[in-house]
């Protein structure tokens, strides 16, 4: 489970507990980043298993996690598993006869979908994503039922957010006077910018504007400490920092979509075209994709000159909450 997924399932868990009075169990793999986020979210998740570094370690860690999950889940005795495509979780649910509901917005993640969707009862994803991208994972004649919603997963925790500028000022930042940046996943195989490509953008921004940086990796503080940037070293939920920024610049998608939902211009440097980003853009949300340094700076200049503006209109009337199809499934309406 990634930090984004913990945010999603923590939010879905609270929603289902409140609307249906259901009892929920949230689990996550044990990493430093996940523990820090879990502490912010109220320690709701139980940690089960770890990650491996190479193929054999990953396989062994997955097998050990299945055993641990089987014990925990069997004692909890749930009616449903609600998860991202997690081979270990889905295998346990299948083995224990538990119905499975899968969420996803990453059709490019081939292996985990191939190992989970055919064993799942329900598959929920945004209508912004072309259905054909997921069809290769659906077994013909199988039992997986597809449900779509007009929205993005980030709405689950952005909706109802109330800005608090004191959380920004504590870092010495003046509201609406800084850029918020987050480095990319430079170790991901699909990322082609390289460390220096993103650093070049941050350097350019810091020459004329205040820049706050939320690290992705432990060594990011060292990687960018030669630049004039404010490193947010403690664990944070980024919504306040995003809301009060001039704009966000990120190598990933989650922060960009969060900011766009808040009406804040966001620049994403993610190398692949993401359907949910394009869907938000088509509805007028200020999310922009850059594929080069020059394109990124052109967008940023548009933000600085005012040709690209904040959007004040609420997202609530345009988008469907991702919990709605889940609620209908659990209530037996679909």
Give residue spans per PLM region.
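A conserved, positively charged/aromatic
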Residues: 101-103, 113-125, 242
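A nucleotide-sugar donor-handling region in carbohydrate enzymes
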Residues: 123-193
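Catalytic binding pocket for nucleotide-activated donors in carbohydrate/polymer assembly enzymes
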Residues: 261-307
């Amino acid at each position: 489970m990634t930090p984004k997924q913990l945010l999603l399932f923590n939010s879905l868990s609270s929603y289902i507990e409140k609307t249906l009075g259901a009892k929920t169990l949230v689990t996550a793999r044990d990493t430093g980043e996940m523990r820090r986020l879990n502490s912010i979210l109220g320690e709701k998740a139980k940690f089960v298993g770890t990650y491996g570094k190479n193929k054999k370690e990953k396989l062994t860690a997955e097998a050990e996690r299945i055993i641990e999950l089987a014990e925990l889940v069997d004692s909890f005795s749930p009616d449903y598993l609600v998860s991202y495509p997690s081979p270990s979780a889905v295998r346990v649910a299948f083995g224990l006869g538990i119905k499975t509901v899968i969420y996803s917005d990453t059709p490019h993640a081939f292996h985990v979908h191939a190992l989970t969707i055919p064993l799942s009862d329900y598959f929920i994803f945004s209508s912004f994503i072309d259905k054909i991208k997921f069809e290769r994972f659906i077994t013909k004649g199988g039992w997986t039922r597809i449900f779509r919603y007009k929205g993005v997963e980030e709405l689950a925790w952005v909706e109802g957010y109330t800005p608090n500028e004191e959380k920004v000022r504590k870092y010495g930042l003046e509201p609406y006077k800084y850029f918020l940046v987050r480095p990319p996943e430079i170790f991901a195989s699909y990322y082609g910018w390289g460390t220096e490509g993103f650093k070049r953008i941050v350097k350019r921004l810091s020459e004329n504007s205040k820049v706050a940086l939320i690290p992705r990796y432990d060594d990011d503080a060292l990687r960018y400490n030669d630049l004039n940037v404010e490193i947010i070293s403690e664990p944070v939920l980024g919504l306040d920092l995003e809301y009060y920024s001039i704009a966000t610049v990120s190598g990933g998608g989650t922060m960009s979509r969060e900011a766009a939902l808040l009406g804040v211009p966001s620049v994403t440097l993610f190398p692949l075209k993401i359907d949910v980003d394009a869907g938000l853009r088509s509805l007028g949300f200020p999310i922009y994709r850059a594929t080069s340094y020059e394109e990124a700076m052109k967008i940023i200049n548009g933000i600085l000159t005012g040709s690209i503006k904040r959007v004040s209109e609420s997202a609530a009337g345009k988008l469907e909450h991702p919990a709605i199809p889940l609620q209908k499934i659990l209530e037996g309406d679909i």
